[in-house]
Amino acid sequence: MFKKQSRQKGREKRHLRIRKNIFGTPEMPRLSVYRSEKNIYAQIIDDLNGVTLVAASSLDKEFDAKGSNKDGAKLVGELVAKRAIEKGVTKVVFDRGGYIYHGRVQELAEGAREAGLQF
């Protein structure tokens, strides 16, 4: 009998497939998303140098909303975009981390776009 693959393992395999094609450069770094059950995290990464340029999450001190809902995800997107623009980053490559582009991941992306990031 075949064993059913867990959702987490499937997401990790999808993420590896996506990462083969997505690569962040100093001119156009990668906006990476991680979604846990209660929080959401976003970081902008320069893969060429292996450096995280900017990071934001629903656990930050500046963050006052709830991180487990869409409104919180949108605020995290706006926060990471604001910090990126302060560092001089305006264009990024979006890495959804193997998650479906729906719900909190979509809201984070839309919040970052509204705050001025281009992808």
From Swiss-Prot:
Among CDD domains, the record links this protein to: Ribosomal_L18_L5e
Q: Does the keyword Methyltransferase apply?
A: no
Cellular component terms per the entry's GO annotation: cytosolic large ribosomal subunit
Q: How does it assemble?
A: Part of the 50S ribosomal subunit; part of the 5S rRNA/L5/L18/L25 subcomplex. Contacts the 5S and 23S rRNAs.
- Pfam families the record matches: Ribosomal_L18p
What biological-process GO terms show up in the record? translation
Which organism is this entry from?
A: Clostridium tetani (strain Massachusetts / E88)
* Family per record: Belongs to the universal ribosomal protein uL18 family.
Q: Name one GO molecular function term.
A: structural constituent of ribosome
**What's its job?**
This is one of the proteins that bind and probably mediate the attachment of the 5S RNA into the large ribosomal subunit, where it forms part of the central protuberance.
Q: Could you tell me the keywords of this UniProt record?
A: Ribonucleoprotein, Ribosomal protein, RNA-binding, rRNA-binding
Q: Corresponding gene?
A: rplR
What the entry lists under PANTHER family is as follows: 39S RIBOSOMAL PROTEIN L18, MITOCHONDRIAL (PTHR12899), LARGE RIBOSOMAL SUBUNIT PROTEIN UL18M (PTHR12899:SF3)
What is the protein name stated in its UniProt record? Large ribosomal subunit protein uL18
